Amino acid sequence: MAVPFRRQSKGRKRRRRSHYKLKTPTIVVDPQTGEFTLPHRVTPNSGYYKGQLVLAKKVKKED
């Protein structure tokens, strides 16, 4: 089995790991409800996308 010829330095190891970071998600405000949502997605509560109603909410029947 192969073994590394030399030990990697701390700087080389840290430079490689510098890309292992999390990105913060982009959040936009829904104009209909004022809630924070992800961009380019239908908002689950209002059902609007680009100002048009895409998903109609189901109304529960009360007895």
UniProtKB/Swiss-Prot annotation:
GO MF, one annotated term: structural constituent of ribosome
Annotated Gene Ontology cellular component terms: large ribosomal subunit
InterPro entries in alphabetical order: Ribosomal_bL32 (IPR002677), Ribosomal_bL32_bact (IPR044957), Ribosomal_zn-bd (IPR011332)
Keyword terms of this UniProt record: Ribonucleoprotein, Ribosomal protein
Keyword Ribosomal protein: yes
Pfam (any one): Ribosomal_L32p
Lineage top rank: taxon: Bacteria
Naturally occurring in which organism (per UniProt): Acholeplasma laidlawii (strain PG-8A)
Family classification: Belongs to the bacterial ribosomal protein bL32 family.
GO aspect biological process, one term: translation
Protein name: Large ribosomal subunit protein bL32
The encoding gene: rpmF
